[in-house]
């Protein structure tokens, strides 16, 4: 141990009346804690009950957990209406706070207004790093843009019918059809599936929707890769993935049948050269890629 470090520990022991061993033990624990724990993003999850499906809530919250901690979970809608009955069954289980909003005027969406007002109130608390907006409604485009202007990260979740304006206003947009396919797969493995034919029909429909994969945007992906490479002509997978999302927030490898971006890259051998490189001072390997000549 260096003399400078030794002097620091001796001073701590004198100041706090601790033994030298106790100071070393506490300091080592703090060092391990600081190195192993990365701060998680504090996220506000706001759900538009009129434009979201309760059937995907478990998969939705699991997806959100990939981005950070759902510190606030609220859902907005008229829960006296029959259309919201499916949501009422899951609110308590997933600790989601319902915000009742009656339709005061025909033709006006009071739910949208309530959600936007709450979002702005939460924004000005300065307690959050980002927002998760669960809706397929383009009326929230302005809200997403406002949150971004304040420096917060915006994650959007909605169906494929969601207008481009809202999807592109988010930093990242996830299609709920992808999450629905996860629910369908689990349900098919469950022995309770045979109890209701209606459930089986819904499952098959959900799977069919996802199996109809869109055409792979080869030109867009290669163009993004060209902008991601360094001076050597290679790009790390992380840099490439980040650039893809910036250009097209709803880009998701799962839409094309691959669980992760790395799986997609490895499968497209006709498009990419790939290398796994050891990072200095670590056993971890990083995937690098470039376009094939």
Question: In which residue ranges do the predicted regions lie?
Answer:
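Domain-level signal for Mg2+-assisted phosphodiester chemistry and nucleotide/NA-binding surfaces
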Residues: 16, 20-124, 145, 153
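Intrinsically disordered, low-complexity glycine/proline-rich and charged
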Residues: 145-188, 272, 278-279, 287
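N-terminal regulatory modules in eukaryotic regulatory proteins
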Residues: 189-293
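Helical mechanochemical/support elements of P-loop NTPase systems and associated helical scaffolds
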Residues: 45, 53-56, 60, 83, ...
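Residue-identity detector for glycine
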Residues: 4-7
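Compact, basic/aliphatic-enriched, mixed alpha/beta core segments that act as assembly/interaction modules
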Residues: 107-169, 245-255
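Intrinsically disordered, low-complexity linkers and terminal tails enriched in Pro/Gly
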Residues: 19, 25-40, 179-214
């Amino acid at each position: 141990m260096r003399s400078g470090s030794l002097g620091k520990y001796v001073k701590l022991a004198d100041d706090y009346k601790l033994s030298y061993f106790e100071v070393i033990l506490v300091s080592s624990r703090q060092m391990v804690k600081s190195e192993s724990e990365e701060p998680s993003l504090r996220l506000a999850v706001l759900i538009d009950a009129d434009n979201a499906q309760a059937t995907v809530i478990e998969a939705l919250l699991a997806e959100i957990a990939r981005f950070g901690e759902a510190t606030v979970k609220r859902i907005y809608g008229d829960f006296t209406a029959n259309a919201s009955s499916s949501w009422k069954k899951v609110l308590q289980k997933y600790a989601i706070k319902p915000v009742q909003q009656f339709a005061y005027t025909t033709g006006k969406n009071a739910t949208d207004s309530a959600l936007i007002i709450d979002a702005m109130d939460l924004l000005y608390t300065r307690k959050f790093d980002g927002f998760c907006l669960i809706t397929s409604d383009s009326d929230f485009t302005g809200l997403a843009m406002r949150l971004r202007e304040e420096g917060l990260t915006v994650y959007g979740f909605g169906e494929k019918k969601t207008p481009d304006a809202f999807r592109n206003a988010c930093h990242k947009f996830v299609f709920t059809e992808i999450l629905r396919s996860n629910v369908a797969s689990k349900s098919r493995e469950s022995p309770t599936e045979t109890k209701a034919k209606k459930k089986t029909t819904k499952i098959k429909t959900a799977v069919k929707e996802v199996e109809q994969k869109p055409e792979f945007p080869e030109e867009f992906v290669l163009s993004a890769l060209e902008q991601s490479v360094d001076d050597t002509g290679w790009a790390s997978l992380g840099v490439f993935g980040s650039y893809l999302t910036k250009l097209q927030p709803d880009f998701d490898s799962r839409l094309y049948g691959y669980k992760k971006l790395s799986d997609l890259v490895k499968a497209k051998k006709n498009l990419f050269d790939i290398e796994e490189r050891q990072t200095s001072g670590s056993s971890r390997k990083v995937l690098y890629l470039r376009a094939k000549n």
